[in-house]
């Protein structure tokens, strides 16, 4: 049996809709576009292909519409991608593009992004407000952060990960993805599927603004410097932040193991780096406790309102 990993390339975020598909197709030469407006039909076809190709290592692109739908598959060792036509922005770059049209049953209902744009825009507005409140929360913790201590943590981690690692090649390949996002099914993620085969797991803990993403960004920069390929999983609230890195050449992953993507793994070998304990004055939550509670409450309210709007798509 081949290995399957699942991830998202689209997200409903505090900065609106994002599309990370291009970096995942950059190394792919042959792209098959499935033309059919019904995502259930497309999913059924892709699942049939998955069954037929169960000996291959396959990347499965999850749909942001439902946890039961998939938007495409990539068989990287064959340089082949099969994806829903609606996701692909025409940019051939010399690629071999084929189109497969599945006849549409006129009596069937199908989902159209354009038909539901008002709903998405309403949800994005709530997520944007949530991100703004989250930024305020970050400032509280940043005000009590010791950046010298943070730099020391980073220095030690880089030494641990890259000691004796030689430059691999001139240019690293960077795959930009999401391990989860806000959907009509609620907040979803595929973290366990992605990290299960990774030998060295590093979980980064902390509070908002305590440098979790910054730590991973420094690791990312080192990988790029050394020509090491990286899977970069962006934050679905703020896509400018990083929630996870997977460095398969080193058999290492770094994961922001805080809500809403906390995972419980009973593995004593997991390394924990707690940026709050390591770098922040522990009096901050006593000094600003009431303000923190208010901001957390407002943040959760906005996110829940946004999710409620997305969930209304299930009844349409």
Label every PLM stretch briefly.
Residues 194-195, 244:
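Short, conserved, surface-exposed binding loops centered on an aromatic residue
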């Amino acid at each position: 049996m081949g290995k399957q990993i699942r991830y998202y390339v689209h997200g409903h975020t505090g900065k609106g809709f994002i599309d990370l598909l291009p970096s995942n197709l950059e190394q792919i030469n042959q792209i098959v576009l499935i033309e059919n407006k019904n995502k259930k039909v497309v999913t059924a076809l892709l699942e049939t292909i998955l069954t037929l190709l169960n000996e291959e290592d396959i990347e499965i692109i999850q749909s942001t519409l439902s946890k039961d739908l998939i938007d495409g598959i990539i068989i990287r060792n064959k340089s082949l991608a099969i994806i829903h036509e609606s996701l692909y922005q025409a940019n051939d770059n010399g690629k071999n593009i084929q189109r497969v049209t599945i006849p549409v049953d006129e009596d069937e209902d199908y989902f159209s992004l354009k038909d539901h744009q008002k709903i998405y825009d309403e949800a994005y507005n709530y997520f944007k407000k949530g991100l703004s409140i989250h930024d305020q929360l970050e400032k509280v913790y940043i005000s009590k952060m010791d950046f010298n201590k943070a730099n020391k943590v980073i220095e030690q981690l880089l030494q641990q990960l890259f000691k004796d690692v030689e430059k691999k090649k001139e240019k690293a390949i960077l795959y930009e993805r999401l391990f989860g996002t806000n959907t009509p099914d609620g907040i979803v993620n595929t973290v366990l599927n992605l990290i299960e085969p990774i030998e060295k797991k590093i979980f980064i803990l902390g509070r908002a603004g305590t440098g979790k993403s910054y730590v991973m960004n420094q690791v990312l920069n080192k990988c790029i410097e050394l020509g090491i390929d990286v899977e970069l999983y962006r934050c679905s609230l703020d896509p400018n932040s990083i929630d996870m890195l997977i460095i398969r050449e080193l058999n290492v992953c770094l994961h922001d193991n805080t809500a809403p993507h906390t995972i419980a793994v009973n593995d004593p070998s997991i390394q924990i780096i707690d940026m709050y304990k390591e770098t922040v004055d522990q009096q901050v939550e006593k000094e600003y406790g009431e303000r923190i509670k208010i901001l957390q409450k407002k943040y959760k309210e906005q996110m829940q309102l946004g999710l409620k709007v997305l969930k209304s798509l299930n009844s349409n």
